[in-house]
Amino acid sequence: MAYKRVLLKLSGEALMGDASYGIDPAVVQRIAQEIATVVQDGFQVAIVVGGGNIFRGIKGAAAGMERATADYVGMIATVMNAITLQDALEQLQVPTRVQTAIAMQEVAEPYIRRRAIRHLEKGRVVIFGSGTGNPFFTTDTTAALRAAEINADVVFKATKVDGVYDSDPKLNPQARRFTTLNYNYVLNHELGVMDSTAIALCKDNSIPIVVFDLFGEGNIRRAVQGEDIGTTVGGSCEVS
């Protein structure tokens, strides 16, 4: 299946490369190059980026911070990643806008749904930073929410693995990779696709989710073009 308007969910950890913290410029440039190719192909691209390479709210809470405060710090981390990715894309002459749910007018536009859609219609990449703007919500939930708001055809979750497995493939060499799954199976079996709120949002709005390996050469383009890579989660999908 080919798509027109897509939402790409990037984890903050994906921007680290082989480092244990921060941003690897070479990785960001490679991701930007792939996104640029997709834009040149005529697709409308929105992006939600996490902040776990800099700060993760739930870990901060576990270390003694108030959870809401820790989540706000994590939201700010996502903006750092969003601006970094924007810079890499604009160096490739890809017009890009960052919109944030928390006002940061010196560095980003406020999130306005109609403006975001207009940017996409004009061929600009839109990167959504600072999550939903509310604590206790993950960036996976942000991806599902923004996808519904902008009428995206699909959510692509780019990860370090090539799909969804029935157990951890690092611990179990016999782990089975699924090709397709339905929302209810994912929710009932608590598979680590996205958190349950994000899955439920996609289910309620009939938005398919494609989980694929970000680091396979050309995988972003292949996924957007509708090739069968990774695992697809959808309402009509059989478990296979």
Curated annotation (Swiss-Prot):
GO terms for biological process: 'de novo' CTP biosynthetic process; UDP biosynthetic process. UMP binds at G51, D71, T132, G133, N134, P135, F136, F137, T138, T139. It catalyses: UMP + ATP = UDP + ADP. Its main location: cytoplasm. It holds the Pfam family AA_kinase. Keywords: ATP-binding, Cytoplasm, Kinase, Nucleotide-binding, Pyrimidine biosynthesis, Transferase. Its EC number is 2.7.4.22. GO terms for molecular function: ATP binding; UMP kinase activity. Catalyzes the reversible phosphorylation of UMP to UDP. This is Uridylate kinase. The gene is pyrH.
